[in-house]
Amino acid sequence: MEQLPSHPTNRRAKEEGNAVPLCRAKPSPSFINLQASSPPVTLLKILPTKLPSGINHKPKECLGLLECMYANLQLQTQLAQQQMAILENLQASKTQLAPGKENKNSSLPALSRNLLLSHLPQFSK
């Protein structure tokens, strides 16, 4: 019997099962108070949620989507810097192995690290 290729959503579910979870979803800082006998939409009240008193520190997990995105971009920047260091080491090794020979078909361009890093976005909190 011939096996059909797995459906993309099944494959994604398997991959997500092994993935490290990102930030857990947090409730919105405000919510709409709806009751069974609520008045028309124009009279709905939006009430802010308040944290219990005595909590002055941030929990270890992300507080919201923007914090998760910021942490993700910081990680991507760090990985890009590590990849640049690896490329620089490869380029240096290549020059040491063949001194005086310039290979025009080189797959590693001679770009400086500072030039590439200057094009990375800078984030500040």
Swiss-Prot record:
Keywords associated with the record: Chaperone
Record's keyword annotation contains Chaperone: yes
Source superkingdom: Eukaryota
One cellular component term from this protein's GO annotations in UniProt: cytoplasm
Any one GO molecular-function label of the UniProt entry: protein-folding chaperone binding
Description of how the protein assembles with itself and partners: Interacts with HSP70. Associates with HSP90. Interacts with TSSK6; this interaction is direct and recruits TSACC to HSP90.
Protein name, entry field: TSSK6-activating co-chaperone protein
UniProt similarity note: Belongs to the TSACC family.
Region (Disordered): 1-22
Function: Co-chaperone that facilitates HSP-mediated activation of TSSK6.
